[in-house]
Amino acid sequence: MDFRIADTFTGSLARLTGDEQKAVKTTAFDLQMNPANPGMSFHKLDKAKDKNFWSVRVSADIRIIVHKTAGSLLLCYVNHHDKAYDWAERRKLETHPKTGAAQLVEIRETVQQILVPQYVLEEPKKVAAPKKRPFAHLSDDDLLSYGVPIEWLKDVREATEESYLALADHLPAEASEALLEITTGGTPRKPEPAEPKANPFDHPDAQRRFRVMTNVEELERALDAPWEKWTVFLHPDQKQ
């Protein structure tokens, strides 16, 4: 079984207290050594759209969210019980249909409001010019090539220069970065589509977010280093 960690796991781990982090790391090491250990308390998340999401008990209130299949265990997120469950219920792990990369996608229907509200203090003297929509000219194929999930295509195309930053927080990193480049006048490089039977975790974009941990030493370095998002999740094109 492949044992992986996601950048969302290390990011959420860093926001816990020191004692909570120690307990989480101990549980993570135990999961890596033997995820089938009867002492591990797995709970299936019935409300999650992704039926492979489970929670693992760390303490009375701390839960690790894992994505578990027959051949893979991925540490996705950690937080206090209710916040951890809420995170999992709003996301799913999927393979992007165009790029072939594994992505943790925020489920569109769970996001009630994206646009930042604009409050008008007084009536404008003139009719305001239509807001620019920097992505309206892009085809579905273009947006998919940049890693935009299918369910977010409509929101991206309707986004304005003002609302884009709020929208970007809900998109996978490679998609938000490509769109940002477009707003600054650039043309992002479109990655080569993966082979049909390729492992979605091997895609260069996925390698930025998910890493296989082959031994305890690797996992310890990934969880302890304050610069883990730069060293462990470095984009393959940037490696020296």
Region annotations inferred by a language model:
Residues 1-5, 42:
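N-terminal "first-domain core" detector
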Residues 29-56:
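A short, surface-exposed loop/turn module that caps and links secondary-structure elements
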Residues 58-160, 164-167, 194:
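Enriched for short, Lys/Arg-rich terminal
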